[in-house]
């Protein structure tokens, strides 16, 4: 009996090749937030659902030396060896239907290369302008298919313009590309390097197993979602795999530093007249009728390295001796201790954003180019979103002690509006220059920092954050029980005053602004304790 790979061996290889292509696209989905899901055997062999379109993928793994134009228009034959009309690769691909709201793209994936007749399809659609071969290919295919047109009006020329041909020469090539995506996704999404190649290979095998099982589900019994790998499910599962690897390898994930909450939310967020204005009261509690000043001062010190050291300084700090660490931190912190109130506000705002949004801070102190050097912000954070574009949170703080908070809060708001109007473009450029992507998780904020685009083009991706502390007569030393309801009313009135300009049809109504209000018994006492504690620690 002749030994060859026809029949069952070839069929099994073909199914495995198709599943590896699907698994590869799932690993792409880890790093590409525009991909929403990868469907297995729903419409075509693989359907890649992205923002605005579906890419219908046909996978072929025959033992051809080279693919030519006749191969994609050759109709299949049925059980009686009669030709089945419109059953060729081209016909099937053209007839794939997407939702009315989504466009169509088409892909053919093979192990073998194409000859000159199909070479045009291997060119990236973005690079096809002025490339020869398009019209010749259209004319030839129209001739071979009698100017075939689908029921939904898709012509051969439509298909050509939306189609690409990809070649993966082996299963191993797909596996290596998928494993590369897995390792990069671990760094991009979670800021860590997987402990070994074995871990990445295991994740690949699990993804491959999942797409195989989804592809096997019956179309008659199961829904399209049952046969789809959805991005939210993938991200949640992948995060758990990375965290499991980190816990086994004993390494701490930097981006999830176990730092303490200095202040906590007081009741629910405040009601707002506008979705673009959000308010939250922060507080610290009493213990044995004494306000927890010491708790705040102690925990402020836990955040000093992250607030006052540059990313490279933090990454290198494990190499230093204890004395060197203290000296480096001391030099950075003492530069800011000349104004303890400003120092404290900066740390409290930083810790609040980090704890509540798992943000990535960009250490900087930006000054606007006005008359003199006036600081407009001290906290800049990237808040990642998925699948939406990442946001940039820009903020500053003020601890109000020498003026009525009800008077000062609207003034702070008006000053913010003025600074945004005059200086946001300068600030965007400086943030772009300052941030060091070597120490940040993968993000897409560069596009909103691009000065060639107006600030207004990305309003929904900027959030301005105000942290305002003040002395409240309702918080006494020692504690007067039962103050909570009155404190809620007092802070609600303050927030209403802050947002009152929106009722007057403010031109800044579309700015997204978060206000954190922090009432305390005595900010003067708190800043004094913080000053003493910080000098003691560093």
From Swiss-Prot:
<keyword id="KW-0051">Antiviral defense</keyword>
<dbReference type="InterPro" id="IPR025382">
    <property type="entry name" value="Cap4-like_endonuclease_dom"/>
</dbReference>
<comment type="function">
    <text>Part of an antiviral system composed of AbpA and AbpB; when both are expressed from a plasmid they confer resistance to phages T2, T4, T7 and lambda but not RB32 or RB69. Resistance is temperature dependent, it can be seen at 30 degrees Celsius but not at 37 or 42 degrees Celsius. The system impairs phage but not bacterial DNA synthesis (shown for T4, T7 and lambda). Partially suppressed by mutations in T4 gene 41, a replicative helicase.</text>
</comment>
<dbReference type="GO" id="GO:0051607">
    <property type="term" value="P:defense response to virus"/>
</dbReference>
<dbReference type="Pfam" id="PF08878">
    <property type="entry name" value="HamA"/>
</dbReference>
<dbReference type="Pfam" id="PF14130">
    <property type="entry name" value="Cap4_nuclease"/>
</dbReference>
<dbReference type="InterPro" id="IPR014976">
    <property type="entry name" value="AbpA_HamA_C"/>
</dbReference>
<comment type="subunit">
    <text>Interacts with AbpB.</text>
</comment>
<protein>
    <recommendedName>
        <fullName>Anti-bacteriophage protein A</fullName>
    </recommendedName>
</protein>
<dbReference type="GO" id="GO:0004518">
    <property type="term" value="F:nuclease activity"/>
</dbReference>
């Amino acid at each position: 009996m002749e030994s060859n790979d026809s029949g069952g061996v070839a069929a099994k290889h073909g199914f495995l090749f198709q599943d590896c292509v699907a698994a590869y696209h799932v690993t792409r989905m880890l790093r590409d937030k525009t991909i929403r899901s990868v469907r297995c055997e729903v419409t075509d062999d693989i359907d890649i659902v992205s923002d605005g379109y579906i890419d219908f993928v046909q996978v072929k793994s025959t033992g051809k030396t080279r693919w030519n134009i006749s191969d994609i228009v050759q109709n299949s034959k049925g059980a009686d060896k009669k030709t089945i009309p419109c059953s060729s690769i081209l016909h099937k691909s053209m007839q794939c239907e997407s939702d009315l709201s989504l466009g169509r793209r088409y892909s053919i994936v093979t192990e073998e290369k194409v000859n000159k007749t199909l070479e045009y399809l291997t060119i990236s659609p973005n690079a096809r302008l002025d490339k020869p071969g398009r019209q010749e290919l259209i004319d030839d295919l129209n001739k071979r298919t009698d100017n075939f047109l689908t029921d939904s009006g898709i012509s051969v020329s439509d298909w050509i313009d939306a189609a690409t041909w990809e070649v993966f020469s082996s299963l191993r090539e797909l596996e290596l590309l998928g494993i590369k995506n897995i390792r990069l996704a671990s760094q991009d999404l979670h800021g860590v390097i997987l402990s070994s190649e074995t871990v990445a290979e295991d994740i690949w095998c699990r993804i491959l197993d999942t797409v195989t099982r989804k592809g096997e589900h019956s179309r008659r019994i199961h829904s399209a979602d049952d046969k789809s790998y959805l991005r939210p499910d993938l991200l949640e599962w992948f995060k758990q795999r990375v965290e499991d690897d980190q816990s086994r390898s004993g390494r701490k994930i930097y981006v999830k530093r176990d730092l303490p909450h200095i202040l906590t939310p007081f009741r629910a967020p405040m009601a707002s007249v506008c979705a673009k204005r959000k308010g939250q009261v922060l507080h610290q509690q009493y213990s044995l009728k004494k306000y927890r000043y010491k708790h705040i001062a102690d925990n402020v010190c836990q955040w000093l390295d992250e607030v006052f050291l540059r990313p490279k300084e933090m990454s290198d700090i494990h190499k230093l001796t204890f004395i060197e660490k203290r000296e480096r931190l001391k030099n950075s912190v003492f530069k800011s201790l000349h104004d303890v109130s400003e120092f404290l506000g900066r740390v409290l705002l930083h810790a609040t954003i980090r704890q509540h949004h798992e943000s990535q801070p960009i250490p900087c102190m930006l000054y606007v180019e006005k008359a003199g050097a006036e600081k407009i912000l001290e906290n800049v954070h990237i808040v990642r979103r998925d699948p939406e574009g990442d946001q940039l949170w820009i903020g500053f703080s003020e601890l109000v002690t020498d003026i009525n908070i009800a008077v000062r809060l609207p003034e702070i708001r008006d000053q913010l509006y003025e600074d945004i109007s005059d200086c946001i473009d300068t600030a965007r450029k400086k943030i772009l220059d300052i941030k060091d992507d070597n120490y940040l998780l993968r993000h897409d904020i560069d596009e909103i920092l691009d000065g060639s685009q107006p600030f207004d083009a990305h309003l929904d991706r900027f959030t301005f954050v105000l942290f305002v502390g003040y002395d409240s007569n309702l918080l006494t030393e020692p504690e007067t029980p039962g103050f909570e309801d009155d404190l809620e009313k007092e802070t609600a009135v303050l927030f209403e005053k802050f947002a009152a300009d929106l009722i007057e049809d403010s031109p800044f109504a579309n700015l997204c602004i978060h206000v954190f209000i922090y009432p305390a018994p005595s900010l003067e006492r708190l800043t004094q304790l913080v000053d003493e504690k910080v000098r003691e620690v560093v």
